[in-house]
């Protein structure tokens, strides 16, 4: 039965017992649903969670985690976790990734309880500050560890979506961001990196604060699109197995996004997406790609097929490509195309990826002490530099000292 097509045509058919049979089928398979969570870590991540909440994303639990109790209080989410409340007293990390890391480790049990039982976990965070940079990798690790400890046959898929600072934000923040991305690569299957400078090229006249909101909107729309294409009926579905095959072990990834309402709108939207890359890499360096279209009700499958021909022409012949499309009446005549490519190389941000994924400098033995453990100190470079051979105290060190802890 083409029930949806009949419904869209304004035809209502009511066969005796049909609804009862349909209900029985739904009940029989309801236990096999895909469980999805979106976890926002730190201020930027929390902003994305609030935006997703306002957008009404269907099919995912929204979880906010932060060291800043005040920001967490105004974040709209289904679950909230205050990280390291005995370390920061809910006052934030002071921009220090070390404090973000310690706070997340101190709240490991609460994090594990919040992320248990999911098949796909998105982690959103801004790289370069304290909580997102330091805590997000810990959250990613705990997602994996919790599943293993509970005897899960298949580990959850962990996809991190992060922003990389503007160059104008300074070298210290950029170095912190690089460090955070390197650590996220340890425990995330895929890390999608949105370079703020590339974002600004799309909307160069936006004030800085508006540019940050635009980044939040982009991440929220991307996550919403993937979640709802998996969970809801679409014109062409991307199922969980498709996402898993593209994202599992995908490593660094980029997103390109484009829109068009021209006569050749689907093709133009894809070309715009391939041009408007959010990370400075060359297309063709990626190994796999996920393409998602958001379209109005009048877009034909033929238009989408022509657009996909462009994708196949632009990407490497060896690339594995999955695509899907869903209808959103609010799009009107506009087509939006989103391209996510995994396995990319970006020397400026990532350098030698293989060298960065050596877990010996990140995985600390289970008997670690959170405060005063020299093994933890080795994980954190001196982001602030030094003078005359002496380490410059960080904001995080000051917070820990104020709370009575020894400096790391």
Swiss-Prot record:
Gene Ontology BP term (one): protein polymerization
One cellular-component annotation, GO: cytoplasm
PROSITE patterns with a match to the protein in the record: FTSZ_1, FTSZ_2
Family to which the UniProt record says this protein belongs: Belongs to the FtsZ family.
Annotated PANTHER family: CELL DIVISION PROTEIN FTSZ 2, CELL DIVISION PROTEIN FTSZ-RELATED
Highest classification ranks of the organism: Archaea, Methanobacteriati, Methanobacteriota, Thermococci, Thermococcales
Lineage: superkingdom: Archaea
Matches recorded under CDD domains: FtsZ_type1 (cd02201)
Provenance organism: Pyrococcus furiosus (strain ATCC 43587 / DSM 3638 / JCM 8422 / Vc1)
Protein name: Cell division protein FtsZ 2
